[in-house]
Amino acid sequence: HSPDNNCLAIDVSDPVGIQMLLKQFNVKLVNAQKYIELARSIKSDDELICMKASIETAEKGMWLMRDKLQAGMTEEELWSYMHKVNIENGGEWFETRLLVSGPRTNPWLQECSNRVIESGDLVAFDTDMVGPYGYCADISRTFVEGNRLNDEQKRLYSMSLEHINHNKSLIKAGLNFREFAEKSWKLPDNCYDNHYPCIIHGVGLCDEWPLVAYPNRDFSNADYSANFEENMTICVESYVGEVGGKEGIKLEDQFVVTKDGLKQLSSFPYEIDI
């Protein structure tokens, strides 16, 4: 089909397939992920319907986890309720195992374990759930065992909520990533080294492009040249945890980009509002 172009983009293949391909054909292989994710970044109306179904299922699981949360159970026991609800409702799989409690909430990105949850612990999680129809529900919340935040937990929670609310208020179709990153909410110095890797990322069949990295001091750590476009679906991220601190707060919500701003797809309330 293209005799003068021997470049072939491949998404996924096993090693044997690659060996056979290179043996039989004179091709230059490149990673197809960035091209595929760019093509998937603008969602159709049908895709949004599928995504909303996945989010609805995820939030059922989140409510069940909040109802079941109690001191004496393990992180893995609590996390199992998310899997139960996803499978019961025709869902598929989870990208990660991000549910942690107490001191394991700081720093972020530790994997779910058999640690026993204690009275008053924060319990933070990221759904990363591929639900019904194969679309991802990517929502983060931080619960507290006993349903009552102490003063320090409230302080961290309020900062994380301010982080989310400020950043989501900036985004609309046409906004450049660099302008957004420059105007985005900045963590205090004692939290900077614990920052989440990105401010926002795309979401579809899994976590996808676009991605706006959490900026370093001179914005040299990533490519900020693209723009937000209408019907992109994105997640706005926040993690607030002081370096060396006891606990941390993880929040994340899912949105669709419009010409007038963001339309929120996730609806689970924040702990500070319940």
What do these predicted ranges mean?
Residues 1-274:
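Active-site neighborhoods and metal-handling regions in enzymes and metal-associated proteins
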